[in-house]
Amino acid sequence: MTRVKICGLMDEYELECALKAGADALGFVVEIERSRHRLSLDEARNLIGMVPPFTTSVAVVEPAGVDDAVRLADYLQSDALQIHGDLSPEEIEEIKRRVPQRIIVAVPPGSDRAVEVSRIADAVLVDTPVSGGLGGSGRTHDWSVTARMRSTLHAPLILAGGLRPENVMDAINVVKPYAVDVSSGVETNGRKDPVKAEEFVRRVRSCQ
């Protein structure tokens, strides 16, 4: 079964929207300045604390280094840490050794470091590159490239980038990911839309 993560949740209303839609995981963007979904540490920690049992809370972070990642993990207390940026495999391995959270590492399609990172991380998230990093563009990428990546990885692949109810079934059929990750694709006027969120999850489930 393909899992669903709804990311970029900003407040309790959006959290409830994602839960009612049936998302398996909820994502919170923490202190990433380029993201319009960014939360402060305290805002993120408060929302993470509201995530019920059997739903995975994911803190999306861009740490400056190992110590910064550990600081964020310790404070936020999420179930998983989604790491963006250019940390080396050695740094990711050190983070994994020092924190209890599952580690998801974000990479662009066709990344040279994806295979090495996948030997360490609990999952690899493939997202569309944007100026200054990954994610938040609302744009898809070449799914055939990501499908080829999947067969080389040693960890589950999470597909992100421009997904929405209208294209998620095609994306799953091409890539066959462990999970899909959506944010702006289930929004209307910059806010999570319960109808779109429910339709997105319904279409993912129909692929099973």
From Swiss-Prot:
InterPro entries: Aldolase_TIM, PRAI_dom, RibuloseP-bd_barrel, TrpF_fam. Gene3D superfamilies: Aldolase class I (3.20.20.70). It catalyses: N-(5-phospho-beta-D-ribosyl)anthranilate = 1-(2-carboxyphenylamino)-1-deoxy-D-ribulose 5-phosphate. It comes from the Archaea. Its EC number is 5.3.1.24. It holds the Pfam family PRAI. GO terms for biological process: L-tryptophan biosynthetic process. Keywords: Amino-acid biosynthesis, Aromatic amino acid biosynthesis, Isomerase, Tryptophan biosynthesis. Pathway: Amino-acid biosynthesis; L-tryptophan biosynthesis; L-tryptophan from chorismate: step 3/5. One of its GO terms (molecular function) is phosphoribosylanthranilate isomerase activity. Belongs to the TrpF family. PANTHER family: N-(5'-PHOSPHORIBOSYL)ANTHRANILATE ISOMERASE. This is N-(5'-phosphoribosyl)anthranilate isomerase. It comes from Methanothrix thermoacetophila (strain DSM 6194 / JCM 14653 / NBRC 101360 / PT). The lineage of its organism: Archaea, Methanobacteriati, Methanobacteriota, Stenosarchaea group, Methanomicrobia. The gene is trpF.
